[in-house]
Amino acid sequence: MRIIVIGAGLAGLTAAWELRKRGHEVSVLEARARVGGRTWSLRLGNGAITERGGEYVFPTEFAIRRLSAELGVPILSHNVRYARRTVDGRHVSFAELEATTEQITETLRGMLADGLTRVSVEDAHREALGPDYQQHPVYRRMVTSLANDPNLVSAASAFLYDPDADQPFIDDGGRFVGGNQSLAIELARRLGAAVRLEHPARAIDQSSSGVEVTLADGSTLHADAAVIAVPLPILRSLRLGFALTPGQDAALSHRIMGTAAKLGVPLAAVDDDIALQSTDLSWWSWRSLSADGEHRIPALSCFAGSRATLDALHTEAGPGRWVSELQALRPELVIDGDVLLTDWSDDPWTRGSYSAASLDWTPADLDAFDVPAGRVAFAGEHTGLEQTLNGAVVSGLRAVTAIEAVERLTETSGGPA
């Protein structure tokens, strides 16, 4: 089949790569002048690579690790306490982290058993950890990573449906040696001329015989099927001339887009804390292991999550306030060159960072995108519960399975109704 993939982030490129390997003719349309979407790597003035977007590849995230091995894109450990950051002078032990997480989970189960509904991440932490819960390192880590208001995010989605729940917890994460964008760049290199940059799609329609994609310049492209792999706000802005399945409509209505910012800071000197969390705002900074396995890279990476935190850091006005807060938290920091701020709320092709499950989320949403809507499948972190680089890859693979259903239906009946 001829298949159009809209979006050249990790989700779309994974789908395109797998579809080509299975003998399909693919075309990938990307609005930007680069591939990678929310993976975006640049070098700071001192030569250190910084990630403007997605950062961590965790040990049990097998889909993206399998893909990186296939493509020969190596992974290096960050060697950072991702889940056990220093907060107010201490970080929790491995055992305390596991015990606290179990305490919150069991408290949540009890709340739900008592008939409570629409229980938020905030509610679960408050009930489990008591009046000082907002100062607890486990709370501070989770709400930072949510990139959303924890009062609006489903606790059940966060604690009861973890896709890695059956895997051992390992407090480490990896990064691609050449920058996290390097995986997307290698996929695009192998796909070659099939990837078309600066080709934003505006509308998509379908019939029993195929799909039609309308570009921003008014031109149209035709194919047998399509995969839409764009961020949630962009998906909502596309003109779709067809209906989604009821399950897909419901699942999308249960997603809320978060926002986040990153700060890359070249340095000449800093303290030795590799993972330091703000005590009152949802941001943290870390320093990754270098490729020599001994030293740290000459840069700090910082992540801030949620609209309230970005407003408090005045990111709309530039990096100045955030840099001041960072230097107050790390008084030994000596900055060596220009810092690099990336505010994803300002990005026209994402309009935010990544999504979360709202209080209306239900477990039925989990399977909504296993099937296509006619001849169209969907990919992207918003189609599942993994808001990670691996989640993007998993969603691309899921979309391939959905497209194969289109192919089977086409072969047996001449096309979807």
Regions found by a protein language model. Name each.
Residues 37-64, 157-165:
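Glycine-rich active-site loop/strand segments that organize a redox cofactor
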Residues 48-114:
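Dinucleotide-binding Rossmann-like beta1-alpha1 core, especially the glycine-rich loop
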Residues 2-28:
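N-terminal Rossmann-like FAD-binding beta1-loop-alpha1 element of flavoenzymes
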Residues 112-203, 208, 229-239, 357:
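Active-site/ligand-binding neighborhood in enzyme catalytic cores
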Residues 14, 22, 210, 280-417:
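Conserved flavin/dinucleotide-binding core of flavoenzymes
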Residues 20-45:
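Glycine-rich FAD pyrophosphate-binding loop
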Residues 206, 215-273:
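Central helical "cap/lid" subdomain
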